[in-house]
Amino acid sequence: MNKENNKEGQGDALRVIISGGGTGGHIFPAVSIANAIKELRPDAQILFVGAEGRMEMQRVPDAGYQIIGLPVAGFDRKHLWKNVAVLLKLVRSQWKARNIIRQFRPQVAVGVGGYASGPTLKMAGMMGVPTLIQEQNSYAGVTNKLLAQKARRICVAYDGMEKFFPANKIIMTGNPVRQNLLAEKPEREQAIRSFGLNPEKKTILILGGSLGARTINNTLIAGLQLIRRTTDVQFIWQTGKIYHQQVTEAVKAAGEIPNLFVTDFIKDMAAAYAAADLVISRAGAGSISEFCLLNKPVILVPSPNVAEDHQTKNALALVNKQAAIYVKDAEAENKLLPVALETIANAEKLSELSENIAHLALPDSAVVIAKEVIKLAQQS
């Protein structure tokens, strides 16, 4: 440990609240930040605040941290009348967040996005607790724009974010990723064999996020016979839990497809990335950060069902630098598989995509953010 870290390790125990979640794209960075804080300050006490019934309530304890849930829910943009109940839950969540902050007495509160970060960071700011928000996307969400008014630091992953936030608060950190992806780099052959596939064939990895992606799954279901006929290419397909039964039934009905591996959730993502010559994915900010750090050629199919269409903006930030291929969700059923097969057959294109996306990587993001958290605590 260097002198700077020794200095940061001294003094009273550091107490930090980290709030947010909802999807793996928020949870994995949050845990990475917590781990980095503990590396720098082993004495740190870290409490997570999430949303009741959401994925973080299981994943955070699995990572070794305590979490408390708020009764918060997202706004229903299609059925506005349903938001009366949502507003009541928001009031209850703010009251509960206030009590959590009073009891835990954090020196800093960190928001990583997701339902719980709004009420938690709003109450922290009102109670005089320094706050730091992490904006993962290239287009800032409404909640973070509101929280930015009282935030001391705003950690971002894209250029040009001063159009959303005060420039003097912004720090370019990139998005934290799962540390094991960088620490564990299995050999390609070993990784492919772990999925029961052939190391001599090109491999396409299909991701839809931890919950799944309807369009990507339906496109692959419609293309099962094309997949079977394309014997020189193989596929690792993560369906997400919601769509797994539908996909497995379709695959079973299609008959044996030896060049296809299907699972609801890939636990060993380091192996999946090592196996992949090309990735098909939604355009979540966390996933994009992983592709950049691992230099993975990717076809992005942004979800249309997200606030402010931020995934399309994330994708275009890469496409404009020739660092990814973009297929619209509405065009995926006709275009996605043909574009993927054309791309994986073009070694020059794969190399160009890999080289260009590597230039966008921002390593050590979690450590940079952790150091900002510690600085805020020392100033409070």
UniProtKB/Swiss-Prot annotation:
SUPFAM superfamilies: UDP-Glycosyltransferase/glycogen phosphorylase (SSF53756). GO terms for cellular component: plasma membrane. Keywords: Cell cycle, Cell division, Cell inner membrane, Cell membrane, Cell shape, Cell wall biogenesis/degradation, Glycosyltransferase, Membrane, Peptidoglycan synthesis, Transferase. It is found in: Cell inner membrane. Its main location: membrane. Disulfide bonds: none annotated. Its EC number is 2.4.1.227. CDD domains: GT28_MurG. It catalyses: di-trans,octa-cis-undecaprenyl diphospho-N-acetyl-alpha-D-muramoyl-L-alanyl-D-glutamyl-meso-2,6-diaminopimeloyl-D-alanyl-D-alanine + UDP-N-acetyl-alpha-D-glucosamine = di-trans,octa-cis-undecaprenyl diphospho-[N-acetyl-alpha-D-glucosaminyl-(1->4)]-N-acetyl-alpha-D-muramoyl-L-alanyl-D-glutamyl-meso-2,6-diaminopimeloyl-D-alanyl-D-alanine + UDP + H(+). It comes from the Bacteria. Coiled coil: none annotated. Pathway: Cell wall biogenesis; peptidoglycan biosynthesis. GO terms for molecular function: UDP-N-acetyl-D-glucosamine:N-acetylmuramoyl-L-alanyl-D-glutamyl-meso-2,6-diaminopimelyl-D-alanyl-D-alanine-diphosphoundecaprenol 4-beta-N-acetylglucosaminlytransferase activity; undecaprenyldiphospho-muramoylpentapeptide beta-N-acetylglucosaminyltransferase activity. It is an enzyme of class 2 (transferase). It is a peripheral membrane protein. NCBIfam families: murG (TIGR01133). Cell wall formation. Catalyzes the transfer of a GlcNAc subunit on undecaprenyl-pyrophosphoryl-MurNAc-pentapeptide (lipid intermediate I) to form undecaprenyl-pyrophosphoryl-MurNAc-(pentapeptide)GlcNAc (lipid intermediate II). Belongs to the glycosyltransferase 28 family. MurG subfamily. This is UDP-N-acetylglucosamine--N-acetylmuramyl-(pentapeptide) pyrophosphoryl-undecaprenol N-acetylglucosamine transferase. The gene is murG.
